[in-house]
């Protein structure tokens, strides 16, 4: 259904519902949109809804994503590239998911939450606050479980970048500081290391607060 813009090479399996009206009770039939990039896989029973005029009016999905069976992408979500939604993972309205993020099976993401690039949410996680890039989280509600080191290695992160990311994680999560204090301590190094700046910028702009 639409209006929907679908890129090339996408694969839709049986019973997937793509571009349907959203389930937001404020929706009154406005001509909102779904935009899908290239080479995504939507497995059986996956549902993706269009946006609402209360937000940007569109749901946006990038390229090379895998949405396993019975996953759900609600209205106004913005999904990056190369993400994986394992079976039953659900993103509520207005959620943003960064590139290469992975949601384990039956993960539930609260409205307006942002999940950073390369983050990993363990199966059954309930995500109520923003998840910074590179983090692993698990539980209901979810808590931090370290850095997604193996995923970063597979994507070409070198030992120096990994070391700086680990140090930043300790600064935010292990020293008993406030978020503001941790960001101040990381400011100088973040200006020199792009991978670290992605981490600190995300935290500084987290409107819901971060998982801690």
What are these regions, as identified by a protein language model?
Residues 1-143:
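Structural signal for interior beta-strand "rungs" in well-ordered beta-sheet cores
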Residues 9, 15, 26-27, 39, ...:
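Terminal amphipathic alpha-helical/low-complexity segments used for targeting or macromolecular assembly
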């Amino acid at each position: 259904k639409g209006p929907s813009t679908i890129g090339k090479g996408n694969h839709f399996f049986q019973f997937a519902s793509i571009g349907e009206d959203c389930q937001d009770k404020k929706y009154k039939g406005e001509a909102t949109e779904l935009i899908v990039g290239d080479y995504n896989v939507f497995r059986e029973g996956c549902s993706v809804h269009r946006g609402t005029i209360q937000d940007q009016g569109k749901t946006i999905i990038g390229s090379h994503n895998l949405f396993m069976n019975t996953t759900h992408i609600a209205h106004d979500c913005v999904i990056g590239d190369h993400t994986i939604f394992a079976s039953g993972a659900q993103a509520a309205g207005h959620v943003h998911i960064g590139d290469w993020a992975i949601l384990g099976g039956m993960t539930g993401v609260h409205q307006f939450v942002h999940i950073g690039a390369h983050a990993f949410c363990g199966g059954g996680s309930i995500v109520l606050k923003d998840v910074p890039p590179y983090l692993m989280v698990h539980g209901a509600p979810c808590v931090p479980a370290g850095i997604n080191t193996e995923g970063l290695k597979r994507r070409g992160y070198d030992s120096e970048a990994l070391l700086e990311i680990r140090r930043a994680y300790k600064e935010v999560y292990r020293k008993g500081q406030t978020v503001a204090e941790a960001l101040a301590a990381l400011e100088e190094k973040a200006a020199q290391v792009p991978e670290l700046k992605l981490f600190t910028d995300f935290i500084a702009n987290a409107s819901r607060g971060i998982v801690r």
